[in-house]
């Protein structure tokens, strides 16, 4: 159970980080 929660947290953090980087790159290209 704890393993799945940690995997979910890591996936969520990774997705959030990529979304933030993508938004930053988009704002820089404009």
Curated annotation (Swiss-Prot):
This is 3.2 kDa protein. It comes from Pseudomonas phage Pf1. It comes from the Viruses.
